[in-house]
């Protein structure tokens, strides 16, 4: 079964690639599109294996995890945990003044945590590993060719690690209240009195827990 499956995949791949001309030589071994968690790990592994790697990103290095996901959400949860512990201190025989939240300072610490981790996902670090980092909009021309704002680069393999973006659901009236998303929420400087979170995924659950 494994041999048959491999043959079937090879035939399907040949049919898929039949409309494109494969270059005789390549500019690089591997192109990674997207510098989020998946893209950075892929580029790192490729560079570790001594492959020539080109990493393409159009926005911020680190992607969702560093800038609007894992890192800021954990920093916010840490602040929320401290607040919860102080509220329960009396149960442990510890008297503390009623804690107050300075939300602007909380968000300032969140940004500082991001800045602390940024160097690990930076262009400088990956350039030091031998990765060629490019900023721009990548567009697939063929299975081996990528256009980056007019510059064409060929590679033996291409990895798509472009991630995703928040989707605003079609709920009547939602567009009239200027809803936040998991990307724009981090711009808040005042703690909202009420917050409705639509979506029970990892980030949604973390934000609900923290707020």
Predicted regions and their residues:
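N-terminal Rossmann-like FAD-binding beta1-loop-alpha1 element of flavoenzymes
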Residues: 28-55, 204-211
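Conserved acidic residues
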Residues: 36, 137-139, 201
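Rossmann-like NAD(P)H-binding beta-loop-alpha module
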Residues: 189-211
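Surface-exposed strand-loop junctions at beta-sheet edges and helix termini
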Residues: 31, 185, 196-198
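Conserved N-terminal Rossmann-fold NAD(P)-binding element of oxidoreductases
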Residues: 33-34, 56, 160, 198-199
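Glycine-rich flavin
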Residues: 3-28, 45-51, 56-191
């Amino acid at each position: 079964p494994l041999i048959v499956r491999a043959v079937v995949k090879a035939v399907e791949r040949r049919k898929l690639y039949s409309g494109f001309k494969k270059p005789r030589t390549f500019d690089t071994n591997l192109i990674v599109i997207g510098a989020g968690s998946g893209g950075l790990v892929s580029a790192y592994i490729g560079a570790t294996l001594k492959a020539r790697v080109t990493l393409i990103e159009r926005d911020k290095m680190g992607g969702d995890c560093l800038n609007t996901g894992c890192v800021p959400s954990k920093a916010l949860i840490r602040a929320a945990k401290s607040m919860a512990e102080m509220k329960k201190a009396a149960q442990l025989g510890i008297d503390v003044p009623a804690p107050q939240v300075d939300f602007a300072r909380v968000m300032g610490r969140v940004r500082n945590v991001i800045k602390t981790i940024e160097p690990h996902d930076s262009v400088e670090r990956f350039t030091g590993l031998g990765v060629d980092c490019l900023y721009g909009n990548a567009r697939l021309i063929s299975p081996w060719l990528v256009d980056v704002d007019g510059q064409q680069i060929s590679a033996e393999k291409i990895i798509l690690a472009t991630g995703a973006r928040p989707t605003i659901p079609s709920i009547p009236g939602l567009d009239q209240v200027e809803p936040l998303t998991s990307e724009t929420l981090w711009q808040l400087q005042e703690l909202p009195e009420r917050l409705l979170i639509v979506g029970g995924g990892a980030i949604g659950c973390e934000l609900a827990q923290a707020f």
